[in-house]
């Protein structure tokens, strides 16, 4: 099974080891993710739609964005919008996405790159295709996972980081 490693593990937020009070959870249902549209109209499949949040914690939701082959002028993004108390982890399989936020974070992520945004105490951000993708069209496909922050970190300082595909290597587990 592939594992993801980076040169400096300190670039990623810490995930605590499960405590003794935590137990393995069984799969309670298998569903088909409904299709819909997000933001200004980009296609998504929402994997956790209709699932009780208490069963998902620490996850909030996960969207598959695309896979879509846009024509010129078709790529869509989001308007400025707020987040608070969780993190978004966005992975781009194909295409390019631009992020900008009210904390000064942001950048362009593309094939194999990951964007990790901690909303913490609150942040405004926008996600949009870059101008060249809007002008020429092209393939876009990615995933975004929302991860709930523990109560003590809900008001933490917002932050943003890009993890480039070249910084990540795959290892095979035995």
Label each region the model flagged.
Residues 35-93, 168-174:
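A short glycine-rich, His/Asp/Glu-containing loop-to-beta-strand
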Residues 61-64, 106, 132-135, 148, ...:
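NAD(P)H dinucleotide-binding glycine-rich loop of Rossmann-like/cofactor-binding domains
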Residues 119-152:
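Ligand-binding loop in jelly-roll beta-barrel domains
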Residues 141, 148-174:
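Conserved, well-structured core segments that form or line functional sites
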Residues 76-78, 103-106, 128-135:
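Catalytic micro-motifs at enzyme active sites that drive phosphoryl/nucleotidyl and oxygen chemistry
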Residues 90-111, 123-126:
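A short beta-strand-loop-beta hairpin characteristic of the jelly-roll/cupin
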């Amino acid at each position: 099974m592939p594992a993801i490693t980076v040169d400096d593990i300190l670039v990623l937020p810490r995930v605590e080891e499960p405590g003794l009070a935590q137990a393995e959870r069984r799969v309670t249902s298998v569903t088909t993710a409904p299709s819909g549209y997000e933001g200004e109209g980009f296609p998504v499949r929402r994997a956790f739609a209709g699932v009780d949040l208490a069963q998902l914690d620490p996850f909030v939701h996960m969207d598959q964005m695309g896979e879509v082959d846009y024509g010129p002028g078709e790529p869509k993004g989001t308007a400025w919008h707020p987040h608070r108390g969780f993190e978004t982890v966005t992975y781009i399989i194909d295409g390019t996405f631009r992020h900008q936020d009210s904390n000064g974070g942001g950048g362009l992520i593309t094939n194999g790159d990951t964007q990790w945004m901690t909303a913490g105490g609150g942040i405004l951000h926008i996600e949009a295709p870059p101008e060249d993708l809007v002008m020429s069209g092209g393939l876009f496909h990615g995933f975004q996972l929302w991860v709930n922050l523990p109560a003590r970190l809900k008001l933490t300082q917002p932050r943003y980081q890009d993890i480039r595909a070249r910084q990540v290597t795959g290892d095979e587990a035995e």
